[in-house]
Amino acid sequence: MDELGFHRTLHRPGTLLDVGAHEGGFTLPLAALPGSRVLAFEPLPESFARLRAAAGQLAHVTLRQEALGDATGEAVLRLPVVEGVANAQWASLAKRYDGFGPQVGERRVTVPLRRLDEFGLDDLTAVKLDAEGAEYEVLRGAVETLRRCRPVLSIEIEERHRPGSTWAVPAFLDALGYDAFWEHWGAWRPMAEFDRATMQVASADPSVFAASDPYVFVFYVLPREQAPAMLDRLRRAEAGAVSPPAP
């Protein structure tokens, strides 16, 4: 099951949060789910312009040209520039790219920074989070919302983006009453079975993913009080016994 399948299977009407929306590749499928209202954050101006062109006419989609974190104000977003070409998909608040080599530099963009808790959401049912190493800060700024709404989450976490993040983020969520899982070939495994020493070997070289089999970087996080029932639904969906909601 892929990340979108996870959200389709566990979909409940309400607000769906897309953090790191980029150009809308996840925003639009979320918006197609019945009874959904999507709140999408993308701070990079050029990516936000494409996101707005793709989804800006949808009345139930709200787009914010802001970054999320654990403070309010401004932050510096860094993009790697290789051979003079900037890579928007790797834009990060947590990483620095200058010094990687003679042909690698970085472009810096100052962006607005908000905490999710400022928005006072009371119907958040799902979160997709891809913040290129800043996931911990995003979650710290969302504690009140997570406690109040108990959404499900899918989070990309990689040691190559931020060393220590594969234990720090799940530990933070564990303290909030959440359990993290990863999936491989239909098997849903607890975070305790994740081996960062063998399952993220590509952290040493971002261009080589074959070094880990599997390379695990998407983690699925469930409210502890609902985890058994949700895992059962996910497993039955993998087996074809549960159909996702029709758009």
Regions found by a protein language model. Give the residues of each.
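Phosphate/nucleotide-binding beta-alpha loop and adjacent structural elements of enzyme active sites
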Residues: 1-247
